[in-house]
Amino acid sequence: MWADIYHKLVEIYDIKAVKFLLDVLKILIIAFIGIKFADFLIYRFYKLYSKSKIQLPQRKIDTLTSLTKNAVRYIIYFLAGASILKLFNIDMTSLLAVAGIGSLAIGFGAQNLVKDMISGFFIIFEDQFSVGDYVTINGISGTVEEIGLRVTKIRGFSDGLHIIPNGEIKMVTNLTKDSMMAVVNIAFPIDEDVDKIIEGLQEICEEVKKSRDDLIEGPTVLGITDMQDSKLVIMVYAKTQPMQKWAVERDIRYRVKKMFDQKNISFPYPRTTVILSEKKTN
């Protein structure tokens, strides 16, 4: 008899456990589908909005899309979590009432969360940077991949993805907003003909100006900017469109190398002068 009762209880609890797991799985599936569906609607909304009469830069649209998706996901996560807690017969209302909103916030570190979210709001509101911008944040440089309510993600050229809490962002340098300055310093031996080199650099500047459409001003030969024991340095500078300074600098350096080869001008190298003295002996 006792064995029958035991097996009956096990059967009942097994049924309840399976039902509980199925309910949790159902909530998770609904949350997953809800997130995917919301992402699709948000994408469609901003795509249609970008084609409306009110034009916004594509970077701004990408930023708003990312931010809206993050906000909706947080809401769905919260609702799914509350539904799962309800399966444990835990009422969120009574939980907040018993614990107190203030103590619960402190206990879960919500102060930092609120700080991050407020900072994220002002980043968007003040248009400090957008998705796709190349920025330097707290000494870390990279391209902004995502701006969320809590964190900002930037990817460096070679050092991976950096995830920075919005509340920790103290200083931002945005290299995409305005024009940039391309600067190339050309060094050559001090005994070379300066006029010949300046003339060649001016020809290069004219060639670059005619061949590129990403220049705002220049390039211009500034003149000799440094004198050392064995070399002189001439600076060439140009104002470029955002994110084009490096391409312009590479182009100028390439043309300078070809010009030096054609004119038989050597690049400076360390020199050591040795003076030998001969002693006369009787």
Curated annotation (Swiss-Prot):
UniProt keyword Cell inner membrane, yes or no: yes
SUPFAM superfamilies cross-referenced by the UniProt entry: Mechanosensitive channel protein MscS (YggB), C-terminal domain, Mechanosensitive channel protein MscS (YggB), transmembrane region, Sm-like ribonucleoproteins
The protein's assembly and partners: Homoheptamer.
Lineage summary: Bacteria, Bacillati, Bacillota, Clostridia, Thermoanaerobacterales
Keywords linked to the UniProt accession: Cell inner membrane, Cell membrane, Ion channel, Ion transport, Membrane, Transmembrane, Transmembrane helix, Transport
Protein name: Small-conductance mechanosensitive channel
PANTHER family cross-referenced by the UniProt entry: MODERATE CONDUCTANCE MECHANOSENSITIVE CHANNEL YBIO
Places the protein is found: Cell inner membrane
Annotated InterPro entries: LSM_dom_sf, MS_channel_1st, MS_channel_C, MscS_beta-dom_sf, MscS_channel_2nd, MscS_channel_C_sf, MscS_channel_TM-2, YbiO_bact
Single annotated GO MF: mechanosensitive monoatomic ion channel activity
Membrane topology: Multi-pass membrane protein
Lineage: superkingdom: Bacteria
TM regions (residue ranges): 24-46, 67-87, 90-110
